[in-house]
Amino acid sequence: MFTFGILALILACSTKKDNYINRKWHSTNTKYNVLYNGNLALEKGITDVKATYSDDFWNVLPLERMQITPAEQKEGAATKNANFERAETKATKAIQIHSMNIGGYEKNNQIDESYLMLGKSRYYENRYLPAMEAFNYILYKYPTSNNVYQAQVWREKVNLKLENEQLAIKNLNRTLKGQKVTGQDLADIHSVLAQAYIKKNVLDSALASVKISKKETKLKEEKARYTFILGQLYEKLNYSDSAFVAYQEVIDMKRKSPRSYTIYSHLKQ
C-alpha cells in the first residue's frame, strides 16, 4: 500500500500527463504553496515601497504611490528589495516546476497567475523590460485568462515608466472599445489612462478617467486618493466650486480616508 501511494504521487507529479489528478495536483501546489508565499512577499515589498513614499500634495498626485528617481529609471538601475526577489523566485519556481504545457496548451490554470506575479515583482524592482515580457506572455499565450485585463494594466504601467504615454493610451482605449470591462479592472485601466493624460497635460481627459476610477474602485485608500486628485485637477482647470466639493468629499470620508488626504483637503479649501 505504501509503495502504491509513492507510485501514485510520482505519477501525479508528472507535468506531461494530461489528466484530472495531474492538473489538480500541480494547480493546487502552485496556488496554495508557491504563489501563496510569493504573494505574501510581494505584498510586503509593496508595503515597503509605500512606506518610503512621500506625497507632494501641492502638485497633482500620481495615481500610483510609487516614487522613482531619474537615476532609478535608467536601464539596469534596479531597486533591491528582498521581498520582490523572493516573489520573483517563487513565480519562476512555479513556472519551471508546475507548468503543464501539453500540445501547445497550458493545463495548469495557475501559471498565468505566476507570470503576473513575476511581472509585478520585476516592475517594482524597476526592471521594466523583463516585466513587460512577463505581462506580454499572459496577453499572447492566455487570451482567455481572467488576468488579461490586469496584465494589460500592468503592461501599460510599464509603458508609462518608459515614457510611452501615447502607446499606453492607444492600447487601453482599444481595450475599452472592444470589451465590456467592469469593476476593479475598469478602475485600474482608467487610473493608468489618467496618469498618461496627466503626463501629457491633457487634464480634461485625465479628469474623466479619474472620475471612473473613483466610482469603480473597491479600495478605500484608492477612492480617497482619486477623490483628492479630482480636486487637484478641478483646481488646475479653474473649476473652484467643483474642487471644493471634491475636497469636502474626502473630508466627509472621515476614517475611510487616510489622515494625510483629510488634512490637505482642509488646507485646500
What are the functions of these language-model segments?
Residues A12-Q269:
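Acidic, polar-rich low-complexity tracts and alpha-helical solenoid repeat scaffolds
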